Amino acid sequence: MGCGLNKLEKHDEKRPGNIYSTLKRPQVETKIDVSYEYRFLDFTTLNDAELPGSSAIKLSSLRDLPAQLQELYQQGFVLAAVHPFVQPTDEKEKTPQEQIFRAVLIKKTERSPKGGIHSEGYILEVECCSSVNQLSDKKEIPDFIKKIQDAASQGLKFVGIIPQYHSQKNCLVSSSLTPASNNSVQSRDNKNVSNCPEDHASLDGEKIDGINGCSTPAPGEENADQCATSREGRKGEGQAAEEPDCKSAKGSKEQHEHPGGREAPDTQNGVAENETPARCSKPLTDKTEIFTLFNKPKTPQRCSQYYTVTIPMRISRNGQTVNSLEANWLEHMTDHFRKGGSLVNAIFSLGMVNDSLHGTMDGVFLFEDVAVEDNKTTQGYDAIVVEQWTVLKGVEVQTDYVPLLNSLAIYGWQLTCVLPTPIVKTNREGNLSTKQIVFLQRPSLPQKAKKKESKFHWRFSKEDMHNKPMKKSRKTKLSSGEKQTAEKQEFEVTENTRNLAAQLSAASGPGPEQQLDSVINLGNETAGADSRGTLHDGVSEGTCPASADAGDTGGSEVQACPNQSAPNCCEEQEAAGQDCALGPDSCQGIDGAAADVEPSCE
């Protein structure tokens, strides 16, 4: 796919990354009816001892994420994508960069509001659906997709997946750790994000994953109850189960009065929080769980349908280190975008390698299918794919895709997915660089806008194409308008030929019969051309005129433009059904009639 955006040199270490698009740059920077606004939140499940000096929000569990995003959801933002900064590898020891995540929230703004229609509110739900081992095996992915589709049939909109790592050290951490609610929510742009102090909203849907099977006391409680059911006993089950109501979990045994806190679940704000254990009776050893995130609309909407697209990717290694990851993204995705598919998320791991020798592997990309309604045409999409190099100084982000998203937001480009990779390089300053694949899409521009943009590029060729039918039309009109004149000229040519023959017979000179035959042939050819060809002001285009004065019926003067070999030439061309066009260089007077005939030629 061609992209009009400028690309930097391949070996330039400072380049932000390659950019691919289905549009040229002027079209990319064309505004549409909507624009977007973004918010960014970095968080981790590591504690201060494990991740010192990081500004990322510390969460005791990924189930606390809805509480952190509560205020942004109240402002109309919804979660668009969530991802780790570095794609986890198969190594047992996880790096801090693999356990730092980013949540990207988006808010849609209409340039011309329609009748005060308010955008639909959403509720964020987090569910644990499987262990990471299931996603490493391609055979298990269809079952995973089926679980997502089952949730979608209940009205949920899939956002993404995120892993949570459990080690023996993490599981034995007591509740004396700083609760997630005590951390102030800090976004990258420091706008409209503040702390929700000690405020935990319960799950609006009253649906909590049954794998954990734990009930959680109030956030400030020092002594937490032990888990009723160990996660270890349900490892790999991969199914979400119904649990008792969140209100019943705050029964007489677990109900505690927290100073400054609110016990009542905040279901009106649309933020859901699942309860998590502060300490487990049976420690977990290096276990990883996959959590799925859904946006649940407050009002019933059409159920989403999802399908997968497999895209081959090429990786190169240096031992166990992955040096590069490449794919023809738009070659495999453009057709789905044009048909109305919307990219949601991508699944791949190094355990899905097809051919270790050539370094090929399949990435599974999840699309939301278009809903074709009655009397409505399918809305296609254009896309941008950015291979972004994100630079981390320790655990702090120095360079990322945030400026790019903010610059494209005013043109209506929506972030759909961020695919992390296991590529990690160290630059000269000692900072880490990792590649992230950023996907954006936008409704296709109207055809008028596309034609307007390309008008200058094709201006000259289009004028030529426009002039051709104009010439044909003009020729047709002139031919029909001069039809009677052509018939009249044909009659005059015949009369002039007879008069000329009479003059030649009386004149002296060699070969009068040959000269007469030449004139007769020329007259017949001219008459045929006048009846067949196109006339401009009484003169046939592309042929020499037999008579310059159509109104001269006396035949006193005749103009001719014969060649010395005109008889043979015209006879051969007439036999082939062609016109006899004589050039100006061949114009000569007729022997024996020089006094009566003046040679002339156009």
UniProtKB/Swiss-Prot annotation:
Pfam families referenced in this protein's UniProt entry, alphabetically: Raftlin
Region annotated Disordered, chain positions: 178-282, 451-495, 524-567
Q: Where is the lipid attached (N-myristoyl glycine)?
A: G2
Q: Its membrane topology, per UniProt?
A: Lipid-anchor
The main location is membrane
Q: Give me the residues lipidated as S-palmitoyl cysteine.
A: C3
Q: For bias kind Basic and acidic residues, which ranges apply? A: 197-209, 244-265
State the InterPro entries in the record. Raftlin
- The biased composition feature labelled Polar residues covers 178-195
GO terms under cellular component = plasma membrane
The lineage's top-level taxon is Eukaryota
For this UniProt record, the keywords arranged alphabetically read as follows: Cell membrane, Lipoprotein, Membrane, Myristate, Palmitate
Q: State the compartments where it is located.
A: Cell membrane
Which spans does this entry mark as compositional bias, Basic residues? 468-477
Q: Function of this protein?
A: May play a pivotal role in the formation and/or maintenance of lipid rafts. May regulate B-cell antigen receptor-mediated signaling.
Regarding protein family, the annotation reads: Belongs to the raftlin family.
Q: What is this protein called?
A: Raftlin
**Organism of this sequence:** Gallus gallus (Chicken)
Q: Which gene encodes it?
A: RFTN1
